[in-house]
């Protein structure tokens, strides 16, 4: 089943007098939508009781939940402290996902600035394997980590980089941000054939079953050569 919904709370939600994310599932249901990506982009600051309340509302209104982990994650950092914090941010997001009855956590992998891209991939794979192992130890293995394609050239997040990363564990699901692919390609991923080529590439690398499960973002975007 294909589901549609917003990432975060829209301006129209607040314009209509609503104020709490707990109200989002009912509002989305009324809008004819059936998915909600809760934003932890600035940190995992939600408490357990509120997360459970959102999750209960989502179950009641048949809203499929996911969480976006903090934007400042960098699993490619060569600084051990920064890498450890990044892993912790993902684990915290996964714990919040359990509370919220979410099954997916969307993750920005990090920056490749100053690092050879092949080396960056090796570091990302190592860091992600460690993250998954620790998640399993914490009983969080039922939550899928969903690394996202990113739009800036110096970020880890080409389509092939994300697919390669997802090969390390079948529970991983790629997040395909078509706006980011459009920006990264200089405006080339913007037609039916180009969208189809992306989906065909996912199936080629990860297989049809995971293609059916992909997480996708669509949004307007402006871009520069960087």
Label every model-predicted segment.
Residues 10-12, 40-44, 69-73, 109-113, ...:
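Active-site-proximal loop/turn and secondary-structure-junction residues that shape catalytic pockets
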Residues 2-9, 36-38, 65-69, 105-107, ...:
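Hydrophobic faces of well-ordered beta-strands that scaffold small-molecule active sites
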Residues 131-226:
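Acidic/histidine-rich catalytic cores of soluble enzymes
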Residues 76-175:
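Active-site acidic/histidine proton-transfer and metal-coordination neighborhood
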Residues 21-22, 90, 124-129, 192-201:
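Well-ordered, non-membrane alpha-helical segments in soluble/globular domains
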Residues 1-94:
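N-terminal pre-domain/capping segments
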Residues 1, 33, 60-64, 102, ...:
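A general structural motif
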Residues 52-72, 125-136, 168-170, 200-201:
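Alpha-helix-loop-beta-strand connector modules within alpha/beta enzyme cores
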């Amino acid at each position: 089943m294909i589901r549609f919904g917003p990432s975060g709370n829209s301006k129209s939600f607040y314009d209509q007098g609503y104020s709490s994310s707990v109200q989002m599932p009912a509002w989305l249901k009324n809008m004819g939508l059936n998915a909600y990506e809760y934003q932890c982009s600035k940190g995992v600051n939600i408490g357990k009781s509120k997360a459970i309340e959102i999750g209960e509302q989502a179950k009641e209104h048949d809203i499929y939940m996911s969480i976006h982990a903090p934007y400042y994650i960098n699993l490619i950092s060569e600084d051990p402290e920064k890498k450890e914090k990044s892993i912790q941010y993902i684990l915290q997001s996964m714990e919040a996902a359990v509370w919220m009855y979410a099954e997916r956590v969307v993750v920005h992998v990090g920056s490749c600035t100053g690092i050879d891209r092949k080396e960056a991939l090796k570091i990302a794979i190592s860091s992600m394997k460690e993250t998954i192992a620790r998640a399993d130890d914490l009983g969080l293995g039922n939550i899928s980590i969903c690394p996202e394609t990113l739009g800036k050239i110096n970020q880890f997040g080409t389509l092939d980089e994300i697919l390669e990363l997802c090969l390390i564990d079948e529970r991983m699901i790629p997040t395909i941000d078509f706006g980011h692919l459009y920006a990264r390609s200089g405006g080339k991923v913007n037609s039916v054939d180009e969208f189809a080529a992306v989906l065909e590439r996912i199936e080629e690398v990860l297989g049809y079953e995971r293609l059916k499960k992909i997480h996708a973002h669509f949004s307007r975007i402006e871009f520069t050569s960087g």
